Amino acid sequence: MNAVERLWRAIRKEDWPAAQAQLHEHAVIRWPHTDDRFDRAIDYITAHRLHGGRTRVDVRRVISEGKHVSVYAVIDDAGEVWYCGGIYELQDGHIASGTEIYTREGALGRIADRR
């Protein structure tokens, strides 16, 4: 099991110390959908911790290729379903950087309804 899998397992359990232990202290994680950039592991973990309200975190797929790991997760959050695609780079067995993109189910409406 790699650091990304351990991170998401810890997020699912809301085990914030275990989640933080998977990241380098100065890991850079970007959330382009909100224009957030977390330059320290503690800031990224705090953002997750303060969000709260999750009833289920289901990691559907993890793909590893050397130091690069991708994850696809589905999150039930206070009655809404969110999807996360994450791309991470590992260094010395920890997450050094990553980009996570979240979208809410149906957030943009159906393509057919936009005509």
Predicted regions and their residues:
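Residue-level recognition of short, well-ordered coil/turn positions
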Residues: 15-16, 94
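Short, aromatic-enriched amphipathic alpha-helices that serve as compact interaction elements
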Residues: 1-15, 22
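Alpha-helical interaction segments
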Residues: 5-7, 21, 34-35, 78
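A solvent-exposed, acidic/Ser-Thr-rich amphipathic alpha-helical stretch
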Residues: 16-65
